[in-house]
UniProtKB/Swiss-Prot annotation:
Keywords: Cell inner membrane, Cell membrane, Membrane, NAD, Quinone, Translocase, Transport
Function, as annotated: NDH-1 shuttles electrons from NADH, via FMN and iron-sulfur (Fe-S) centers, to quinones in the respiratory chain. The immediate electron acceptor for the enzyme in this species is believed to be a menaquinone. Couples the redox reaction to proton translocation (for every two electrons transferred, four hydrogen ions are translocated across the cytoplasmic membrane), and thus conserves the redox energy in a proton gradient.
The name this protein goes by in its record: NADH-quinone oxidoreductase subunit D
Reactions this protein catalyses: a quinone + NADH + 5 H(+)(in) = a quinol + NAD(+) + 4 H(+)(out)
HAMAP family: NDH1_NuoD (MF_01358)
SUPFAM superfamilies listed in its UniProt record: HydB/Nqo4-like (SSF56762)
Cited Pfam families: Complex1_49kDa
TM regions (residue ranges): none
EC class: translocase
Molecular function GO labels: NAD binding; NADH:ubiquinone reductase (non-electrogenic) activity; quinone binding
Subunit structure: NDH-1 is composed of 14 different subunits. Subunits NuoB, C, D, E, F, and G constitute the peripheral sector of the complex.
InterPro entries attached to this UniProt entry: NADH_Q_OxRdtase_suD, NADH_UbQ_OxRdtase_49kDa_CS, NDH1_su_D/H, NiFe-Hase_large
Length: 412
């Protein structure tokens, strides 16, 4: 019998017997993951199946748990940034900027306007990357591989822009307290302008491939739907909440990094199903492109970095090599020898897949007393078992893909 696949103490061993006693149906257990290629990460779901229909599901969280929050309690503030890269690595610059803004809020630091605009551009590029990956992979999971080939090359072009800005591609460790370590080169702006010219053509073709595709529509409409009330109750944010009809966006509700200077629409859906989540992300890509163009048009002159308060701002690298005072400050800041205020703060940004927040408690020492990452993927995965109950096994893969659950962010 299928209950032999589980230890006797597992709740499914009891559920199977109860279900058999209720209606006499033949139930089985299916392990989806943790290494199944369709899950796009180290996920496991123990599914209780009635034929091809999912009766119940139990997710297992923590396969790549790396104890980021505990590690952060033993690291100086500047050394926490690489941890943020490795959560949602599809849009790591957003994680970086969110962490710097949390520290700037703690230290009451005003960032130069030019640096704020450059941050907006970087974060919107990261959002586009995130949505390219999510929606193109959703196409692959429904059997439509062509769209993936149309747009995935542009992720590489965005990585080339990252590489020109900071030297890294995926885990960027970009920026610093107070702005950027250096102004962007002319080549970075050239690469950005080329991207803005070429990418919209490919993205329009991508939309046409899917939004008018009968097979794709049949696989996604009314699949994995969640109501606005349930989405709010679970704590959904980002595209998954907006697809359910709630027009909440952190960039508008609590503007940061001068987002109030830009005009953009918040796309919303109606039914909260897989198709709505796909369409909301498609529309958000167009809004991100608009924001980037506005930022370039309004780009102010000036510094990208506040260097006049050396206690918290890393000095320019060329000064570190030739100036003793700069070397001392560089060492003190990186090693965490600069005191910080005793405080308790929360700062959130609109990440690629929802509200990404840092809840920081300090005691005046060189490391955080406590740091909690608000990870949107962790919240979505709590709702996933309910969303796939009654669905077909093939739909479970599509629903997971549409939620854009990233294993690195889920487990942290």
């Amino acid at each position: 019998m299928s209950e032999l696949l589980l230890p006797p103490e597992h709740r499914y061993a009891k559920i199977i017997k109860e279900k058999l006693n209720e209606d006499g149906s033949e139930l089985s257990i299916l392990n989806l993951g943790p290494t199944h290629p369709a899950t796009h990460g180290i996920f496991q779901n123990i599914l209780l199946m009635d034929g091809e229909r999912i009766v119940d599901a139990e997710p297992t969280i923590g396969y790549i748990h790396r104890a980021f929050e505990k590690i952060a309690e033993n690291r100086p503030f500047y050394q926490i940034t690489p941890l943020t890269d490795r959560m949602n690595y599809c849009s790591s610059p957003i994680n970086n900027m969110a962490w710097w803004m949390t520290l700037e809020k703690l230290l009451d630091i005003e960032v130069p306007k030019r640096a704020q605009y450059l941050r907006v551009i970087v974060m919107e590029l990261a959002r586009i990357t995130d949505h390219i990956i999510c929606n193109s992979i959703l196409g692959v999971d429904t059997g439509a591989y062509t769209g993936f080939l149309y747009v995935f090359q542009f992720r590489e072009k965005i990585y080339e822009i990252y590489e020109e800005i900071c030297g890294a591609r995926l885990t960027t460790n970009m920026g610093r307290i107070g702005g950027f370590e250096r102004d962007w080169s002319p080549k970075a702006f050239q690469l950005l302008n080329t991207f803005l010219e070429e990418f919209p053509i490919a993205w329009k073709e991508f939309e046409n491939l899917f939004e008018r595709n009968r097979i794709f529509i049949d696989r996604t409409v009314n699949v994995g739907a969640i109501s606005a009330e349930k989405a709010m109750a679970y704590g959904f944010t980002g595209p998954n909440l907006r697809a359910a009809g709630i027009d909440y966006d952190v960039r508008v509700a609590e503007p940061y990094s001068s987002y109030e200077d830009f005009e953009f629409i918040i796309p919303v859906g109606k039914s909260g199903d897989t198709y709505d989540r796909f369409c909301v992300r498609n529309a958000e890509v167009w809004e991100s492109l608009s924001i980037i163009r506005q930022a370039l048009a309004k780009m102010p002159e000036g510094n990208v970095y506040h260097a006049e308060v050396p206690d918290y701002y890393l000095p320019p690298k060329e000064d570190v090599y030739h100036n003793m005072e700069s070397l001392i400050y560089h060492f003190k800041i990186v090693m965490g020898e600069v005191p910080v205020p005793v405080a308790e703060i929360y700062h959130a940004v609109e990440g690629g897949n929802g509200e990404l927040g840092f809840y920081l408690t300090t005691d005046g020492s060189r490391t955080p007393y406590r740091l909690h990452f608000r990870r949107p993927c962790f919240i979505y995965y709590q709702a996933y078992p309910e969303m796939i109950k009654g669905a077909l096994l093939s739909d479970a893969i599509v629903i997971l893909s549409s939620l854009n659950v990233i294993a690195g962010e889920l487990d942290a």
